[in-house]
Amino acid sequence: MFERKNFENVWEGKMEPFKIVGDVYFVGSFAASTHIIDTGDGLILIDPGYIETLHLVVDSIYKMGFKPEDIQYIVNTHWHGDHTGATKALASLCGAKTLIGKNDAEKAACYFKADILLNDGDVLELGRTKMRFLETPGHTKGTVSLFFETEENGKTYRVGMFGGAGANTLVKEKFDYDNCREDYLNSVHRLLGEKVDVFIGNHVWNNNTEVFGEILRKTGENKFIDSSLWTNFLNFCEKRAISVAETDK
C-alpha cells in the first residue's frame, strides 16, 4: 500500500527502533516488521523475522532499553520464514514460549515447534496486556490476527494487526491451500468489523512504518493513531484480492 524498498540482502534493510505508542515498540527491519509490547511483567514479541536479521532485532531491543531475556512470549502470525525464520534461535536465546495458529503448526515445524497453538478467540494475558487472537486464514491456513489495548497520556488505544495481508499466495501457483481466496476475503470482511485505533503491520509497507516513525521522532506528531489506516488498508486488501482472482482465473 505504501512504498516498498527492496535490498539485495535482507540484513541491509536496517531500521532505527522507536516507540509507536504506549507499550508498543517497533524493533524490526525493512524486510519484515517485529514489534515488542512491554506488559510490565515482561515482553511479548510479535514475529521475529528472518534468521538473517535477528542480530538487528536483538540490537534494537537493547536500544529500546530492554533485553532479549525480558521476552516471555514470541507470537508468530503465520508460518512463512520471513516472520518465523528467527523464532527458534530467539526462543533458545531468551527462553520464551512460542505461539502460532493451530492450522499453521505443521508447516511452521520446518522453522520451529510451537509451545502453544492458538485457536480463534484465544487470549494471551501478561502483565497489563490482554492480547486477543482471531483466526484469519487466506494468506496461510493458520494466519492469526491480534488485538490489544495500550495507554498513553491518559488515553486508551486499541492496537490491531492483520496477521497475513499478502496477496502473493492468492496466485494459483503459490496457493497455500485450496479455497484460500474465499477465506482471505472472508477474513478481510471479518476484520473490518474490528475497531482499531493504531494499526501495526507485519511489513513496514502495510502502514508506512518508516515515514510515520520519522515524523514521530522529528516532530512528535503520531500518525499511527488513526483509525482510518486500518479500514483503508483492509479495503485495499479486498480490492487487490479481487483483482488477483480476476486476472488469474
Language model segments and positions:
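N-terminal pre-domain segments of enzymes
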Residues: M1-K14, C237-T247
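Conserved beta-strand hairpin/beta-sheet module of binuclear metal-dependent hydrolase folds
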Residues: V10-M64, P68, S145-G166
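Short Gly/Pro-enriched turn/cap motifs at secondary-structure boundaries
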Residues: M15-E16, Y25-V27, K113-I116, E135-H139
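Short, flexible loop segments at the rims of nucleotide/cofactor-binding pockets, characterized by
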Residues: G22-F26, I74-T77, F175-C180
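Divalent metal-coordination and catalytic microenvironments
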Residues: D23, I37, D47, H78, ...
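Structural recognition of the beta-strand scaffold that forms the well-ordered cores
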Residues: F26, I44-I46, Y73-N76, K97-G101, ...
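Metallo-beta-lactamase
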Residues: L43, Y50-E52, V123-E125, K130-S228, ...
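Active-site HxH/HxHxD metal-binding segment of metal-dependent hydrolases
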Residues: Y50-H55, I61-V123, F224-D226, W230-F233
